[in-house]
């Protein structure tokens, strides 16, 4: 299985889950010449009347210590959560870690 395709598919799953929960979801388009993530950290940014969710989507493993440090150091406003969603193979729902 192509790892890039698997990651993209999991990002789309996360986007659909958030949209079904009433969030407006923004996803940055991956191109050859620009970084694929918001602030080189987040795959998705979601918003509803309750606040913002900044989401990093991973497949089969947690974030690296370096990425976790970047996430923790990134300033966010009150009402914003920083999350890592991990999709494991053959498991329908992601494991959501709020940082």
Positions of the model-derived regions?
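Catalytic phosphate/metal-binding cores of nucleic-acid and nucleotide-processing enzymes, i.e., regions
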Residues: 1-99
């Amino acid at each position: 299985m192509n790892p890039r395709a698997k990651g993209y598919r999991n990002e789309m799953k996360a986007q659909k889950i958030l949209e079904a929960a009433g969030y407006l979801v923004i996803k940055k388009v991956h191109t050859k010449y620009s970084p694929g993530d918001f602030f080189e950290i987040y795959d998705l940014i979601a918003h509803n009347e309750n606040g913002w969710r900044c989401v990093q989507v991973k497949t089969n493993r947690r974030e690296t210590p370096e990425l976790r440090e970047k996430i923790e150091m990134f300033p966010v406003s009150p009402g914003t959560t920083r999350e890592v969603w991990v999709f494991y193979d053959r498991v329908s729902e992601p494991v959501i870690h709020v940082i």
